[in-house]
Every structure is written in structure tokens, then in C-alpha cells.
Amino acid sequence: MLNTLIVGASGYAGAELTAYLNRHPHMNITGLAVSAQSADAGKLLSELHPQLKGILDLPLQPLVDVAQAAKGIDVVFLATAHEVSHDLAPQFLAAGCVVFDLSGAFRVRDAAFYSQYYGFEHQHPDWLDKAVYGLAEWQSEDIKQAQLIAVPGCYPTASQLALKPLVDGQLLNDAQWPVINAVSGVSGAGRKASMGNSFCEVSLQPYGLFTHRHQPEIVAHLGTPVIFTPHLGNFARGILATITCRLKAGVTAQNIADAYHHAYQNKPLVRLYQQGVPALKAVVGLPFCDIGFSVQGEHLIIVATEDNLLKGAAAQAVQCMNIRFGFPETQSLL
């Protein structure tokens, strides 16, 4: 059994993560933690997330002394704000823990990225170099050797799973950037109350035009420029990305289907549609990314869907953990 500490368990993704790990046969949850200043400190997780009542009636402990909290811990999951993960991860790593960070604090190796897109100066370039980007279907060999796994963002997961087989297969016309229009549920903004996310205010609205931090994350790991426009939808959870591309001359729908099949035929958490495209309802509450496409001449439209809290966060973190420790990849997820 691996002793596990979850920091940031009070949030939406943190609660989903805790539920997955609670039913994992090789994980022992030794503690749930929140920041010392958190209003949730001292409460039961099931008070904040009633669906866990009678299942996870565990207290949320204030994290005061990292060195003390790390004693006897094998695995740490950080479902915390970017700046918090930036400060905490190196301390847990120094204590010998394997860390899975769900924030953006270690996803991109360029330190300048963080001052531009996250608003803080990165102080740990050594860990930026050592961190492995946890896009599970594509980085499994590196994940197996890593001490720090940076779990990808929700939008980048859907976008890269949809595009990477085609980029790597050199099937796209380089003269035209892929255009990603993605809609996310309000849970992507977290539990903290805000006027813009309140019931009567939330609408279907684009945001972060040309400035969203997930755009350079996608570009850094996909290896090709893209235009990315996120949208906030008036629903609780899930992401649907519609991606338009131009194909190289002579590339057919069968070439696209073959590329996807080759990439994901043995990847159980990516589901490919032979006909039609996925709807959001097929993935909400499940750990899958569903992908479908349509071709007309040299034009390609891809639709990718996922639950932003699961394949876009908690489920992928557990998937990475399973890969890292040699467990079945879908253990506790299916």
C-alpha cells in the first residue's frame, strides 16, 4: 500500500481525486489537507461534498508543517493553486515523495512562461527541467521514471489528444494553424464564489482571447502553433472542443482514421467514434476523452469531449499514478 496525502481536497477536482483514490486497492489515504488559512480547515470533506457522506467523512487538516506532513508519505497529490503548488512541490520532493501536481506550476519548462501567463516568477528551474508532462497516453515511458508529474490542463488534454496523432503523422497543412474552439462548464473556474460564475450571470461567452495560459501550454507540447479560444458554458462540468484544420493535399478520411487507431487502439481512456461526433453527456462523470471527426475535401473538423474534472484533472492524475507505479492503467477509474 502506498501512503497518500491529498492537498487541496476541498475543491471540485480534489474531491473527485479523493473518491478515486479511496477505492484504489493500492492506495492508503493518510491525510487530506488544505492551506492553513482555508475556511474549510477542520471541516469534513463530506460536509463540502455531500455525495461523499458515509464514504469519505475525513477531516480537512490545515497544512502547517510540510516536513511533518511528508513523514511516512509515498505519494502527494497537489490539487492547489499554481503559486501554492510552486512552493509546496519542491518541499515534498525533497522529502522523497512522488508528486502529482494538478496545477500549472510545472507544465512548461520555460520559466518566462510563468511570469507572463501566471503572474509569478518561477523559482525552481531545476524542477521545471525534471518534471514530466503527464499526458498519459503519450508520455507513459517518461511517467514511469518521474518523481514530479505535471498533470496537464483540462483544455490542453482534449486538444492534444485530438491533434497529436495528426501532427505527429504530418497529416496537417502547416500553412494553416489548427483552430480550437472549446467550451467548458463552470466547475473549471473552481469552487470559489464569483459574480461572473453565479447562476443568474453565467452565460455562453468566450474569454481569454489570444491570452489564455492554456494556448502556450498546448503549443509547447504539441509542437505546432494553434489558435485557441476558450468559452464558458452555462453548465456545471465537461469540455467540448471543436477543432478545424486544413489537411495536406491527398490526405483522406481513412488516413485520419488510421492515425487515430494507431495512436489509441490500446489506450482504453480514449474512445474513437467510427461515425458521427461525441456529445458532452457521454463523458460527464466518466474518465474518458471521446473523439470524432468529419472530412470534406482538405478540410477537417474534429470534436473532442471530456469531463474537465476527470480526464481533464483527477482521472488523468490517477491514470498517471497507475502508470508510475505499474498498476493497471484504469485501476479505480472504471
From Swiss-Prot:
SUPFAM superfamilies: Glyceraldehyde-3-phosphate dehydrogenase-like, C-terminal domain, NAD(P)-binding Rossmann-fold domains. Keywords: Amino-acid biosynthesis, Arginine biosynthesis, Cytoplasm, NADP, Oxidoreductase. It is an enzyme of class 1 (oxidoreductase). GO terms for molecular function: N-acetyl-gamma-glutamyl-phosphate reductase activity; NAD binding; NADP+ binding. Pathway: Amino-acid biosynthesis; L-arginine biosynthesis; N(2)-acetyl-L-ornithine from L-glutamate: step 3/4. InterPro entries: AGPR_AS, AGPR_type-1, NAD(P)-bd_dom_sf, NAGSA_dehydrogenase, Semialdehyde_DH_NAD-bd. GO terms for cellular component: cytoplasm. Pfam families: Semialdhyde_dh, Semialdhyde_dhC_1. It is found in: Cytoplasm. The keyword Amino-acid biosynthesis applies. It catalyses: N-acetyl-L-glutamate 5-semialdehyde + phosphate + NADP(+) = N-acetyl-L-glutamyl 5-phosphate + NADPH + H(+). PROSITE patterns: ARGC (PS01224). Belongs to the NAGSA dehydrogenase family. Type 1 subfamily. This is N-acetyl-gamma-glutamyl-phosphate reductase. It comes from Yersinia pseudotuberculosis serotype I (strain IP32953). The lineage of its organism: Bacteria, Pseudomonadati, Pseudomonadota, Gammaproteobacteria, Enterobacterales. The gene is argC.
